[in-house]
Amino acid sequence: MRAVEERHPVLLEWFGRRQRDLPWRRTRDPWAVLVSELMLQQTQVARVLPKYEAFLEQWPTPAACAATPLGDVVTAWAGLGYNRRAVNLHRGAQQVVAEHGGALPDDLALLLAIPGIGPYTARAVLAF
């Protein structure tokens, strides 16, 4: 534990010099965090940046995403690859609306029951 405590200031200093200003670091909205986590799976940050904010402008909530045709979500996903993630995001949004009143749950087990959300993604959503 001592080694971690000693490295903490060094890591913070390094991050302060090297950090990138990424839009998903400026939000505490669980939906926005989920969208970013799914977009970033096996996809370069440079590909995600132009899509992320446009996606959230069009679908700022799970309810907005759930109400749109799946084809529109997949079309907006174009260029990110692995369209199954877009399908799962849409299905997950529909489930969130149907089972949780449109708000992402703040419970690990409930998040894991949503399509496309695994342990890492669920914990990332809960961290914010």
Q: Which residues does each predicted region cover?
A:
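N-terminal polyanion-binding entry modules of DNA glycosylases/AP lyases
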Residues: 1-114, 120, 124, 128
